[in-house]
């Protein structure tokens, strides 16, 4: 639903926003719904992420010009932030400075989290395959 007269857009993140993970060659253990376009966001981005139990995103990433905040909705995760591994549980929030490399690994029950970011340049992200290896 878009209401230009009232200045808002309403979307259901699971019903109205397509899982983009397959479009980026990601395995079925990752479900990534990027809602910026669906919501008509100009500078604010929102993503709904679901990772299967024990799945680790196969790359680290950072942004040159934007902060991000992740909020765990269900399950648990470990996040490698630069050289530190941080444990997260339900309703934990973590903020990343720009230029901070990170990667997520789901806990034993999987994890569902929201990622919030500000910025509108897709070239802002840097991804490093295999960044978090044991």
Protein language model features and the residues they cover:
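A short, N-terminal "cap"/entry segment at the start of jelly-roll beta-barrel domains
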Residues: 1-44, 53, 125-134
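Short histidine-centered beta-strand/loop micro-motifs
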Residues: 36-38, 58-63, 105-106, 130
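Short beta-strand His + acidic residue motifs that chelate non-heme Fe in jelly-roll/DSBH
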Residues: 59, 79-80, 96, 102-108, ...
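Double-stranded beta-helix
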Residues: 12, 103-134
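A generic "binding-loop/recognition-motif" signal
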Residues: 65, 84, 100, 109-110
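Short acidic-glycine-tyrosine-enriched beta hairpin
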Residues: 83-99
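Short, charged/polar surface micro-motifs in flexible loops or helix N-caps
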Residues: 40-44, 52-57, 76, 85, ...
């Amino acid at each position: 639903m878009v209401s230009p007269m009232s200045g808002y857009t309403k979307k259901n993140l699971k019903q109205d926003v397509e899982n983009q993970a397959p479009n980026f060659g990601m395995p079925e253990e990752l479900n990534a719904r990027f809602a910026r376009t669906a919501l008509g966001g100009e500078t604010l981005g929102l993503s709904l992420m679901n990772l299967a139990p024990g799945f680790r995103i196969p790359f680290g990433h950072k942004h040159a010009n934007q902060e991000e905040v992740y909020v765990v909705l269900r399950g648990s995760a470990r996040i490698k932030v630069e050289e530190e591994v941080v444990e997260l549980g339900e309703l934990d929030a973590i903020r990343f400075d720009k230029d901070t490399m990170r990667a997520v690994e789901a806990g034993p029950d999987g994890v569902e989290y929201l990622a919030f970011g500000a910025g509108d340049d897709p070239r802002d992200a840097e991804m490093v395959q295999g960044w978090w290896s044991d």
